[in-house]
Every structure is written in C-alpha cells, then in structure tokens.
Amino acid sequence: MRILLLSALFLSLTTLVLSADLGIEKTHVVECNRKTTKGDTVHMHYRGTLAADGSEFDSSYGRNQPLKFKLGAGRVIKGWDEGLLDMCVGEKRTLTIPPEYGYGERGIGPIPGGATLIFETELVQIEGVNNDEL
C-alpha cells in the first residue's frame, strides 16, 4: 500500500513539474465555439523577446505580416506547438518558453543557447474556418 501511494505521489509531482515548464498567460480572452487544434493552419502575430534582458529578437508586427504555419506539426518550436492550442481567433497570450521548449542549448541567430523566451502572441486566423463557426 505504501509503495502504491508513493508511486501515485511521484507521478503527480512529475506531472506538476512537466506542466509548469511552459508558462501560458491569457492576456486577452475571447469566447468562441471553434478553438485551435493540432493540424490547424494558423496565422499568428507575435513579438519575441529574451527573458534575460527584454531585448526583442523578432516580431511579425514590424513586417505587418502574421506567421502562417501548421499547428502541432513541428514546424515551429515546441513551446508554440503546445502553447497555442485551444485558442480563439482574436485571443492574445504571453508564452514564457524555457530552453527545452525553444531552441535548447544551441540557440539560433540572435537567440543565445539556454535562453528563456517570451512571446506575445495573437491568433489572427484559423484557415478553413468560417466566421460563423467561430
């Protein structure tokens, strides 16, 4: 009985730790009937900064062009594939993405290895979904 209880406690703590890795803050909540799911092609506006010093490394707003990609297909960092699920069009979220959900220890371009990333995101469109479905 004691081993069973300890096993259950360990699994609960492991789940808690894993779910705490990716920070998701809903900054503008929108109610809808159709939320994003794996496989959706989405259009996202975003602003990416380094948590360490707040410096901006990329932004779709400056280009006035949202990023289009297939959600959950591994075409973006893991923090986006997981952190942008269950969103409504018009919703805004701030994602705090640790290195293991971002670019890891290798980094890329202006993003150093081991960096925690902050993304301000806004869901602009889910392709193939009509306004009356939202």
UniProtKB/Swiss-Prot annotation:
> Domain of life, per the record?
Eukaryota
Q: What class of enzyme is it?
A: isomerase
List the ranges annotated as motif Prevents secretion from ER: 131-134
Q: What is its main location?
A: endoplasmic reticulum
Q: Where is the PPIase FKBP-type domain?
A: 39-127
Q: Which GO terms describe its molecular function?
A: peptidyl-prolyl cis-trans isomerase activity
Signal peptide segment = 1-19
Where does the UniProt annotation locate this protein? Endoplasmic reticulum
Query: What is stated about the way this protein's activity is regulated?
Result: Inhibited by both FK506 and rapamycin.
Q: What is its EC number?
A: 5.2.1.8
Reaction catalysed by this enzyme: [protein]-peptidylproline (omega=180) = [protein]-peptidylproline (omega=0)
* Recorded GO CC terms: endoplasmic reticulum
An example GO biological process term is: chaperone-mediated protein folding
Presence of keyword tRNA processing: no
Keywords from UniProt, A to Z, are: Endoplasmic reticulum, Isomerase, Rotamase, Signal
The family note in this entry says: Belongs to the FKBP-type PPIase family. FKBP2 subfamily.
Task: Say what the protein does.
Answer: PPIases accelerate the folding of proteins. It catalyzes the cis-trans isomerization of proline imidic peptide bonds in oligopeptides.
Query: What's the protein called, per UniProt?
Result: FK506-binding protein 2
